[in-house]
């Protein structure tokens, strides 16, 4: 049974696999899948209603006994006074994992808005925005035949542009009440018991953002390494792609209220101590909120990210390259991974693919799942809950081909305009019925600026009718007969009216009276 669940004026699909689901089954699926996806704790109390007024009780009762069938709208009312996450609309994308494609999760600091009775609308249909990403499919790799998605899956998708995920992608972008999804996934997988464990999880994520790779083949992208906590001492080992032949080890030792982080470097079986940093867990961890929403546990992530990377990570990386006798490098290639991702996500997909063909380092950075997840959520809208092992780059490629082959994306043929309705129009058919510019006439940079149409005063009939330049006429153009600078020597035989005082036909004698200056206005 497929249902629609509405919370805070936003709607999501929910699949209930049981044959005869009960209200308890529905409540269990809401806790396990949707609440965690929205950034709430699984212990959050809520009420299930159909109209925001009458709560449904009796977990043993089947949904059919309440008249609920597939496709109905289920409304949720939160009972806990907790901040509500900034959740996207029903046509927006579901946020899943940043690096190992975990299930989506959001956590923001928005206050919970009031519920209002609204007529349920079909949230699975949306208007597709006709906006292409690029015109050449050859840059996406060899073409493959993909099976078309089912009609039911397409019913839950609405394409659009201009949407950006509201969650922070890096720790340096975090604000109060918002943490990266990768930090939330790491914290949930680490089973933290105190503030020291939570701080080590954050340190591990900062090392991953800097481009360090956990040592060991079984280390996953968004899970803590094995044996990272032994006898109260934390030990993390890493390698960096820019420093091949070396390994770095972080040994974190609790010392009273502090945690001392010692960074050591191992090159050719020789261990060197490089940097040491002391951190106060209470400055970045809320002890009284451990086990609750991850967004409420961490604080001042921007400060810790700047402090940890500037005083330990980047000096360690520079010292490693110097110890390996590697030349100093500069430019985009040697920027930290987090800066590369922040630059790449500002580009269009075609530019990202072009950068991936430059060198191996840029190819590795441009294939980061975190980046392609961001690009997919930015350029498409998909409310489908994705599995953990989603290939975001391949999914982007598939959706791009699907949108390009859609008939909605075709351009409309522009036809020439009809004959002008004004009589004696000098040129009824414009010489270029298909303007080269997409801007309307009269806009700076449009067709009007490239070929301005000025009024032609040589013909008294069409002198006030704008045309595309000089047009042939039966009347000669108005030009000076003698001196182009001085006044005209005589009246113009073409234009009507009386001549001036210097014409061949002067004014009549005034019989001694002064000339009235008002005659020229009468």
Swiss-Prot record:
Region (Important for dimerization and interaction with PSMF1): 180-324
Keyword tags: Cytoplasm, Disease variant, Methylation, Mitochondrion, Neurodegeneration, Nucleus, Parkinson disease, Parkinsonism, Ubl conjugation pathway
Stored PROSITE patterns: FBOX
A GO term for molecular function: ubiquitin-protein transferase activity
Chain positions with Asymmetric dimethylarginine modification: 518
Annotated spans, Ubiquitin-like: 1-88
Predominant cellular place of this UniProt entry's protein: cytoplasm
List of residues that carry Omega-N-methylarginine: 432, 451
SUPFAM superfamilies xrefs: F-box domain (SSF81383), Ubiquitin-like (SSF54236)
Tree of life domain: Eukaryota
Positions occupied by motif RFDP motif: 481-484
Chain positions covered by the region annotation Important for interaction with CDK6: 129-169, 381-522
Biased composition annotated in UniProt, kind: Polar residues: 87-133
Pathway the protein contributes to: Protein modification; protein ubiquitination
Region (Important for interaction with PINK1), start-end ranges: 92-129
Compartments, record wording: Cytoplasm; Nucleus; Mitochondrion; Cytoplasm, Cytosol
F-box domain mapped to chain residues: 329-375
Complex formation: Part of the SCF (SKP1-CUL1-F-box) E3 ubiquitin-protein ligase complex SCF(FBXO7) formed of CUL1, SKP1, RBX1 and FBXO7. Interacts via its C-terminal proline-rich region with DLGAP5. Interacts with BIRC2. Interacts with CDK6 and promotes its interaction with D-type cyclin. Interacts with PSMF1.
Annotated disorder: Parkinson disease 15: A neurodegenerative disorder characterized by parkinsonian and pyramidal signs. Clinical manifestations include tremor, bradykinesia, rigidity, postural instability, spasticity, mainly in the lower limbs, and hyperreflexia.
Name of the protein this chain belongs to: F-box only protein 7
Origin species: Homo sapiens (Human)
Gene that this polypeptide is encoded by: FBXO7
């Amino acid at each position: 049974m497929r249902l629609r669940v509405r919370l805070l004026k936003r709607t999501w699909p929910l699949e209930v696999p049981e044959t005869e689901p009960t209200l308890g089954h529905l409540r269990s699926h809401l806790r396990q899948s949707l609440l965690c996806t929205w950034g709430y704790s699984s212990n959050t109390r809520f009420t299930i209603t159909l109209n925001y007024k009458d709560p449904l009780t009796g977990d043993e009762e089947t949904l059919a006994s309440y008249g609920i069938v597939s496709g109905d709208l289920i409304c949720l009312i939160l009972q806990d006074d907790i901040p509500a996450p900034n959740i996207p609309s029903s046509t927006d994308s579901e946020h899943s994992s940043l690096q190992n494609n975990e299930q989506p999760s959001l956590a923001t600091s928005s206050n919970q808005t009031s519920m209002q009775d609204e007529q349920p609308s079909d949230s699975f249909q949306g208007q597709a925005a006709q906006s292409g990403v690029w015109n050449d499919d050859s840059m996406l790799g060899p073409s493959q035949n993909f099976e078309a998605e089912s009609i039911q899956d397409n019913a839950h998708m609405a394409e659009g542009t201009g949407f950006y995920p509201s969650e922070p992608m890096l720790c340096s972008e975090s604000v109060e009440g918002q943490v990266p999804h990768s930090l939330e996934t790491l914290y949930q997988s680490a089973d933290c018991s105190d503030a020291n464990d939570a701080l080590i999880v954050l340190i591990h994520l900062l090392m991953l953002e800097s481009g360090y790779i956990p040592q060991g083949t079984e280390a996953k992208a968004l899970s803590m390494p094995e044996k990272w906590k032994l006898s109260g001492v934390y030990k993390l080992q890493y390698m960096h792609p820019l420093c091949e032949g070396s390994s770095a080890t972080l040994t974190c030792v609790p010392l009273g209220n502090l945690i001392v982080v010692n960074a050591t470097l191992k090159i050719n079986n020789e261990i060197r101590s490089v940097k040491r940093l002391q951190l106060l867990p209470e400055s970045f961890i809320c002890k009284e909120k451990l086990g609750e929403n991850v967004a409420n546990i961490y604080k001042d992530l921007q400060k810790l990210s700047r402090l940890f990377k500037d005083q330990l990570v980047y000096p360690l990386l520079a010292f490693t390259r110097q110890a390996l006798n590697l030349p100093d490098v500069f430019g985009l290639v040697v920027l930290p991974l987090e800066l590369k991702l922040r630059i790449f996500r500002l580009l269009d997909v075609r530019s990202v693919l072009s950068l991936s063909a430059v060198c191996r380092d840029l190819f590795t950075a441009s294939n980061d799942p975190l980046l392609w997840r961001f690009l997919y959520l930015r350029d498409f809208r998909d409310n489908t809950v994705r599995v953990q092992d989603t290939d975001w780059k391949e999914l982007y490629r598939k959706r791009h081909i699907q949108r390009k082959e859609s008939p909605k994306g075709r351009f409309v043929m522009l036809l020439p305009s009809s004959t002008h309705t004004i009589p004696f129009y000098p040129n009824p058919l414009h010489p270029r019925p298909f303007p080269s510019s997409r801007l309307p006439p009269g806009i700076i940079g449009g067709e009007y600026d490239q070929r301005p149409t000025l009024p032609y005063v040589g013909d008294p009939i069409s002198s006030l009718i704008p045309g595309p330049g000089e047009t042939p006429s039966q009347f000669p153009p108005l030009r000076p007969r003698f001196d182009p600078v001085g006044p005209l020597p005589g009246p113009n035989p073409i234009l009507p009216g009386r001549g001036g005082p210097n014409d061949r036909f002067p004014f009549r004698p005034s019989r001694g009276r002064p000339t009235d200056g008002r005659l020229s206005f009468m």
